[in-house]
Design a protein with these regions (language model features):
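Coupling and communication elements adjacent to P-loop NTPase active sites across diverse families
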Residues: 3-69, 81
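ABC ATP-binding cassette signature C-motif
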Residues: 1, 48-252
Length: 252
């Protein structure tokens, strides 16, 4: 019953955002579909985390490459409390994605938080053989399927895209599936690897605003300076000797 009430609230919010888009679209010059902005709400008051709660207290003596062939970094330590939003930056190949995968594995096994993960390769998390509706529907209930179709429609999926396998979708559409899953699961911790990279320039500001307003915690990797400045409260640079908190503004 609680889950259905939560879905109804989210459906109402998505419908309202869809109507808002339609009103604004009437006064705008027509643009290609891939440049269409999306309006999306992520999280509820139930996604809030008490300020004193330790979300992550992570330490690792050595971060090795996926094949175990070389040491990427040493003496890694990261602590996150409450609804902090942090970003890990660093040079390509330094091990950011490898580290985030390890953190995601630990957090998603926890029962005291509700963590969801957007990997760099969406295929690591998505079942490509399913349609978006099948992937998002957790109960098999027809009423829930109808709600999910309403959500997807508000996110500019065509009816055809809703019934095609996820494998056939664009990178941006796959990212939307993952974001919608995060919303429907009422996650309070988001683990995001380059979350803005597949969204159009028009949707980028909306995605950043949505993530900045998320009431839970965010642990992310990004090269997107706008995302880092607008969403993240703390920034850590991954160096060979560990994570170093840094001020992005001072780096120019």
């Amino acid at each position: 019953v609680y889950k259905r009430q939560l879905l109804k609230k989210k459906m109402h919010a998505v419908k309202s955002m869809g109507r808002r888009f339609e009103r604004e679209d009437e006064n705008m010059t027509a643009m290609p579909e891939e440049e269409t902005a999306i309006y999306f709400e992520l999280g509820t008051k139930d996604s809030q985390i008490p300020a004193g709660k330790t979300v992550l207290d992570y330490s690792l003596d050595q971060l090795t490459s996926p094949d175990g062939g070389r040491v990427l970094a040493e003496h890694i330590s990261l602590r996150i409390r409450g609804s902090e939003k942090i970003c890990i930056i660093g040079k390509n190949g330094v091990g950011k994605t490898t580290l985030l995968k390890k953190i995601a594995k630990d957090l998603m096994e926890r029962s005291d938080i509700r963590a969801e993960y957007m990997p760099q390769n969406y295929e690591d998390q998505l079942d490509l053989s399913l349609t978006p509706v099948e992937y998002l529907n957790t109960t098999g209930d027809k009423e829930e399927m109808t709600r999910i179709r309403t959500y997807l429609g508000a996110l500019k999926y065509t009816a055809d895209e809703m019934d095609h396998s996820i494998r056939e979708l664009s990178g941006g559409q796959k990212a939307k599936v993952l974001l919608l899953k995060m919303s429907l699961s009422n996650a309070n911790v988001l683990i995001l690897d380059e979350p803005t990279r597949n969204f159009s320039p028009l949707s980028g500001p909306v995605i950043r605003q949505m993530l900045a307003a998320f009431p839970g915690a965010i642990i992310s990797i990004s090269h997107d300076r706008k995302y880092i400045m607008e969403v993240c409260e703390k920034v850590y640079r991954l160096e060979t000797h560990g994570l170093v908190e840094t001020n992005l503004q001072s780096e120019g």
